[in-house]
Amino acid sequence: MRVLTTVLCSALLALPAAAWAQAAAATPAPPTEAAPPTNGGVDVGAQFTSVDGDEARYQRYRDLRNGVLVDGFHITHRKDAWTFNATATHVGYRDQKYTGEITKAGKLTVRFSWDQIPLFYSAADSDQFGLLSATPYTVESPGVSRLPDSLQSAVQATPSLLNSAISSAAQGVEIRQLRKTADFAVVYHATTSTDLLFHLVNTMKSGEQPWAATFGFSNAIELPGPLDHRTTDITGQVQWSNERGTIRAGYDGSFFSNNVPTLVWDNPLRVQDGATGVGPSQGRMPLSPDNSTNGVSATTAWKLGKQTRVFGNLSFSKWSQDSALVPYTINTLLPVFPLERQTADVSADVTGVYAGLNSRPNDRSWLTVRYKLYDYDNKTPEFPVTDFVNYDTSVAAFAHGGTDALSYKRQYFDADYSYNIAPFTALKAGYGVESDKRTFRQFESTKDQTFRMSLDTTGATWLMLRAQYNYSKRTGNGLDEEVFDAEDEGSALPRQFDIADRNRNRVAIIATVNPREQFSMNFSGGYVKDEYVNSAFGLQNQDGRFFSVGADYSPQAHVDVFADYGYEKYGTLQKSRQANPGTQEFDTTRDWTTDGSDHAHTFTAGVSLKRLKEKVDADWMLEYSNAADSYTYGLAPNQTIYVPPAALKQLPGFSQDRTTSSLNVMYYISRRVGLGAGWLYETFNSDDWAWTQETLNALSLPISGSHQIVLTRYAYRPYTGNTGFLKVRYLF
């Protein structure tokens, strides 16, 4: 009320002066103050973090360590036609980012950025469960992980000692990786109609990640797997354009190199290689190989008259990989089989086509037609295999006789016609068909046809609405019965859900209501149902439903309040048959099902104050999510799988929730200086039936008896984290 009174009094006092000014001769307005050639700002302060529980999961993709904070730096400098911009965030931390741009108006733009994204898997710090992450392995050299020989000798002699031996040898280990991306781009306007473009992206990954290194199902190993690789992407293009359209052509290359091509790790159960059926003293596996892609492409968009525009893209690329192949086994006591060739000799030709047309036949209708082609033609020669070594333990015959080169061709045609049935209201009908051809799959080809209808309106000033219904039907052709064995599989019917026959119904609605200028509401909802009509086993059906509702209120120009709630629920039904070869394969009383159900609630609310009374910026946001799932097993009414007293045991449900709250306040004590503070709170909890003190804390499972699973203790553990920020902002 006091502010309103002051404004009214000021307006009344100004009236006589305003009247005099109207009567007097107009005087020229004073010149406006020119923008300074250099301006910017920076935040300097500190951040403080406290975590109870899993520190790694709290930090995850960010770095919230205690320390000095230099954040939000930005600077702009202008001179004549040149402009320079630069930014820096979270300087010196693992998630730091820097950007820079130099522009000469109408002639040149040069951009550069350096972006780091950490991924923190698990920490070695102690919590209420003990060490969060530990391993008995030590890194001898990149890609080589070793156990103490004494541990292997003791366990080989007495396998029941594995748990105690692993626990005594284990040391805490941090498992984390860091992705660093350098991005450089240049746009040079050579002439009024011709541009030259260059783009270089260099992405490096280093560190570790949880890695499964197994000797088979009975001897599974988890250890920190090495990461040290680089991807370089290069693009060079020339673009010509005029008032009717544009044409662009260029080269694209992508090159991947891995500094750790193989992983070798010790077997905790043996210190010496064993003959057939005994097992090796170590294992070896190839990691991601060096590879490259080289391609050319052309893109165009062109006007045909006043009402029609055509556009398209054509690309050809060559994928290749020729790294050295790993021998069949590292076990020195097993036979050595010569490789058909010493390098991979892998290559593929990839063709991409995208073409379309937008047209407006009259003022009330629109027509859009699109076509896409993706052709992956695998040129890799066959690799004959007669015998191979199974898990470095024994020699086995390879019945298939060699490798199969996977190829596929995907074509997509789509057309939409829209008609304005009323002012600012359109009814749209569309049809799309996707045709896929694949090699060495249960179906040689599939066709997925989609029919859709939608209604869009902005006819009322207070309402925006879209409602859409889709029906799609996928069918397979050319069933390859050679991939089935009737005696072993029971029936030659497809059960791979990505190619099996499927009918889908989907409806969705999105609406925004603005009853007042300061207040708006939004709503979205939908339902989808998939039915796999010819799948005797595997996925039978799945459905999903979702809706969200939200509101935004701005009582004043500097104040905004919002809240949103969302709900999602998904279900699946899968079917199988527990059967041994023989008559059981056709016994329907041995059928069983898994009914899966997942649902999630999310709630978000916040308040934003911008330059309230020219002094205060403040933002507060709360996010809460809760998710739960369950799996219910079902049997046939006359089931014969369980013979009393044996009975089916259901799994308990699983749930988890996360709450995040953030508050940031900045108070400006002058036009250039502000004092700020912030607080981040996050908590995560989980109720998982697979979690017990044994599974959470053990480095090998089970704790008693013969142990053949070695872990790093990487798991989804609960945590509560708090981070505070103090900073001084200086603007210049």
Q: What positions do the PLM features span?
A:
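Mature N-terminal segment immediately following signal peptide/propeptide cleavage
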Residues: 37-47
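Gram-negative bacterial Sec-dependent N-terminal signal peptides
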Residues: 1-21
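Gram-negative and organellar
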Residues: 23-34, 48-102, 106-732
